[in-house]
Amino acid sequence: MNQKISTDQTSENISKILEILTETPKKLEALSKGLTKEQLTQPLGTGERSFTEDLTHLINGEARSSEMIYQALLVKEPFFSDFHPDRDWGKLTRFDLLDFSDLLNYFKIRRKVLLKVLSELKEVEWSRTVREEGKKRKESVYWRARTIVMHELDHIQDLEKKLGK
């Protein structure tokens, strides 16, 4: 999964994004296969998150970006409040209290929904934008989907390295 996706919105790049978004849940499941509950909840290194905490972090980040995508598709240039995925959103939702299997199932369901929405978009809809509080630039649906992919690729690569898979 050592891939990078251009910031240029093209049909090819959209296809790559959809492909990676489809593969990520499978990768997470494969990486967790055979790990005990203890292994899933212990830090992956000194000062590091556990696999469960990492998955929680991915869910929090995806939730914020997906919400931005959905708003951009529903409202013309919506304004999106700025709050941190982990420190604010995570503190409210407390996904960190769930078991890994529940988190992974939740991640898979969220991903199915996101993929259904994105796969039905016309290319022009990928250009719809949202503006986040405190930022001058507008971010497109493409940009936010790319953000999810790039963030998840980094974490998958890190997990593969730390788990030796």
What residues fall within each predicted segment?
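Acidic/histidine-rich alpha-helical segments that form the ligand environment
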Residues: 20-25, 31, 88-127
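A generic "alpha-helical surface" signal
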Residues: 15, 19-22, 52-56, 101, ...
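Hydrophobic residues in alpha-helical segments
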Residues: 32-35, 72-73, 118
